[in-house]
């Protein structure tokens, strides 16, 4: 992997997600410990119909999922035969709202990786304005069956 701008493999060739639940358009930077992805939220996104019709706002859960998908992209390049599961979200903060037509970056600094678990600290930005941030925990599970997550309560 390179610390320089791409081109990188397409998002759809790495992630199993598909529209309408794919929230990153492309990866623009990638290194051993960092990934930056971009998404432009279009006016016809289905969630804008109900969130909120008079003043459409991208739901916070969509922003967190975008961070998780960026981290999953990074993890799947290291573990291509695994299924990456989001198993934890900590310190989620929402600083501003965004609406249709907004381009955001999802930047995740990938940290500690042990026992199939990956911890990442992510930030969503529009231009230079911080929108949201969170610490994420992902797990590289076997692709079939019911995963047992280390430290989980299943």
For the regions a protein language model found, what residue spans apply to each?
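Compact, glycine-rich, soluble single-domain proteins
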Residues: 49-73, 86
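Catalytic strand-loop segment that frames the active site of acyl-thioester-processing enzymes
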Residues: 18-58
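Hydrophobic core residues within well-ordered beta-strands of beta-rich domains
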Residues: 21-23, 104, 118
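HotDog/MaoC-like acyl-thioester-processing domains
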Residues: 2-3, 32-36, 98-102, 109-154
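Hydrophobic beta-strand-centered segment that forms part of the acyl-chain substrate-binding groove
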Residues: 3, 70-105, 131, 139-141
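Single-stranded RNA-binding regions, centering on S1/OB-family and related RNA-binding modules
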Residues: 1-9
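Short aromatic-glycine motifs in intrinsically disordered, low-complexity regions
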Residues: 8-18, 80
């Amino acid at each position: 992997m390179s610390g320089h701008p791409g081109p990188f493999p397409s998002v759809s060739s790495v992630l199993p997600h598909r529209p309408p639940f794919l929230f990153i358009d492309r990866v623009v930077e990638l290194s051993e410990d960092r990934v930056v992805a971009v998404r432009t939220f279009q006016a016809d996104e289905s969630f804008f119909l109900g969130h909120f019709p008079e003043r459409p706002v991208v739901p916070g859960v969509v922003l967190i999922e975008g961070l998780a998908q960026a981290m999953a992209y990074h993890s799947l390049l290291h573990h291509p035969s695994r299924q990456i599961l989001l198993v934890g979200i900590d310190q989620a903060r929402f600083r501003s709202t965004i609406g249709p037509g907004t381009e955001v970056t999802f930047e995740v600094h990938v940290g500690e990786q042990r026992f199939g678990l990956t911890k990442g600290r992510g930030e969503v930005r529009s231009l230079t304005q911080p929108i949201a941030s969170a610490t994420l925990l992902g797990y590289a599970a076997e692709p079939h069956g019911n995963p047992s997550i280390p430290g989980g309560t299943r």
